[in-house]
């Protein structure tokens, strides 16, 4: 690896550690030319999984899009940004597991995952998300969903 201090490509690894959940390796290195010590990180480069839209189109999973939808549902609710980040990470992890070998998941499955998480955290956010996700077209559908939540 190229030394950030002198640019030489000869170094030795002083120490290696596995980080996170085993998907990252931290290495302490020493340049053999100038003695400068630096840290490098190795990550597995994973292919993103695809989301199958209702009309059959496929597009890469977009974590920011999921996060924005959940934030919108939880807007002005007593839920921290850290909690939202954790929800998004949990849903993303579930989606990766559910996508299988072909690395594809339907939006309906993702939507149900979001509804499940929101239901356990904040019922108002659940109703907000459900009204958009389930495309309520009249007040009766909205009221019926509220009645289900109250049970």
Swiss-Prot record:
Keyword DNA-binding belongs to the record: yes
InterPro entries linked to this entry: ATP-cone_dom, NrdR-like_N, RNR_NrdR-like
Cofactor(s) demanded: Zn(2+)
Superkingdom, taxonomy of origin: Bacteria
Entry annotated with the keyword Metal-binding: yes
Record note on cofactor: Binds 1 zinc ion.
ZnF locations on chain (unnamed): 3-34
GO-annotated molecular function: ATP binding; DNA binding; zinc ion binding
Keywords annotated in UniProt: ATP-binding, DNA-binding, Metal-binding, Nucleotide-binding, Repressor, Transcription, Transcription regulation, Zinc, Zinc-finger
Ranges of residues in domain ATP-cone: 49-141
A GO BP entry: negative regulation of DNA-templated transcription
Function: Negatively regulates transcription of bacterial ribonucleotide reductase nrd genes and operons by binding to NrdR-boxes.
HAMAP family assigned: NrdR
Family, as annotated: Belongs to the NrdR family.
UniProt name for this protein: Transcriptional repressor NrdR
Species whose genome carries this gene: Treponema denticola (strain ATCC 35405 / DSM 14222 / CIP 103919 / JCM 8153 / KCTC 15104)
């Amino acid at each position: 690896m190229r030394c950030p201090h002198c640019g030489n490509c000869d170094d030795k690894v002083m120490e290696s550690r596995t980080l996170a959940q085993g998907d990252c390796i931290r290495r302490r290195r020493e340049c053999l030319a100038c003695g400068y010590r630096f840290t490098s990180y190795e990550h597995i480069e994973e292919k993103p999984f695809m989301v199958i839209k209702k009309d059959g189109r496929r597009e890469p999973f977009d974590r920011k899009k999921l996060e924005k939808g959940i934030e919108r549902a939880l807007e002005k609710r007593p839920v921290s940004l850290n909690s939202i980040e954790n929800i998004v990470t949990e849903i993303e992890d579930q989606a990766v597991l559910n996508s299988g070998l072909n690395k594809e998941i339907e939006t309906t499955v993702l939507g149900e995952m979001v509804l499940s998480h929101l239901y356990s955290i904040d019922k108002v956010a659940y109703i907000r998300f459900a009204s958009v996700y389930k495309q309520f077209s009249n007040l009766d559908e909205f009221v019926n969903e509220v009645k289900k939540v109250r049970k």
